[in-house]
Regions:
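Short, C-terminally biased terminal segments at protein or domain edges
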Residues: 1-99
Length: 99
C-alpha cells in the first residue's frame, strides 16, 4: 500500500511513518522471542503495542486526508485492531502469570 501511494506521487511523509511503525511491530515481537527475561519480554511486547497504536493513527490520518480509500482502510484497521488486542492479551497473561 505504501509503495502504491508513493508511486502515485501522492504522499511520502505519512507513508514513511506508517511503514516505520508497522514494521516495528513485527520487529519487536520477534525481538521479544529472544528476551533476557520476563520484564524484557513484556517491555518488547509493550513497545510493539505502542507501535500498533501509532500505525493505527497513521492509517486513520491517511484515510481522513483521502490518501487511501475506505475499502483499503477498513480491512487494515480491523487487522491492526486484532493485532493490538492480541498484544494486550499476551501482555496481561504474562503479567498475571508472573505474580
Amino acid at each position: 500500500m505504501c509503495r502504491d501511494i508513493k508511486a502515485n506521487a501522492r504522499e511520502s511523509v505519512l507513508t514513511n511513518q506508517l511503514l516505520r511503525s508497522g514494521t516495528s511491530i513485527g520487529a519487536n515481537i520477534h525481538e521479544a522471542q529472544y528476551a533476557q527475561g520476563k520484564k524484557d519480554f513484556i517491555s518488547k511486547l509493550e513497545i510493539a503495542q505502542k507501535e500498533c497504536f501509532e500505525t493505527e493513527y497513521w492509517l486513520e490520518l491517511l484515510f481522513e486526508t483521502g490518501y487511501i480509500s475506505e475499502t483499503v482502510y477498513k480491512p487494515l484497521q480491523n487487522q491492526f485492531g486484532t493485532i493490538r488486542r492480541m498484544l494486550i492479551s499476551s501482555i496481561n497473561t504474562v503479567k498475571k502469570n508472573d505474580k
